[in-house]
Amino acid sequence: MGGASVLPMKDLVALFGRLGFAEARSYIQSGNVVFKGSRPQALSLAKRIPEELAMSHGFKTRMILLALEEMEEALSSNPFPEGEEDPKSLNIYFLAGNPSKPDMESLEQVKSSSERFSLLGKVFYLYAPDGVGRSKLAASVERRLGVEATARNLRTTLAALKIARDLL
């Protein structure tokens, strides 16, 4: 999930349960919910969850769904292994689709001298050793790529992956 509205994770997990995903799990107040289900079920859920939240909590949100294999592939393809030393310095942006016209030149212009980035398919990696919170690039990735995204630091991504593997 992405967006500025705050929703207690227990409420979000409960919503997954009401929609038939009793084994849903969350990781802190990250917007990440891990659940077990088929691809068709998950695709249906991607529409139903935002609709339910609009009705029950009065705000719009979006969901970006990832299969376990997609998370594993994103982690194994990490072009910045040095980010593993400080997992908060590496943000992984999971994109809603492949960018059709990413503005890589403007990304290059806005990045700081210490930042590095890479776009690999539907995943954008930002290594920001001076902190993602200070990054001008981090705040403009979606706009410059032209596609919706959700970003998680390496620590959160690894935690969500562990929860997903534990559900198997």
Please annotate each region the language model reported.
Residues 1-168:
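Surface-exposed, charge/polar-rich loops and edge strands
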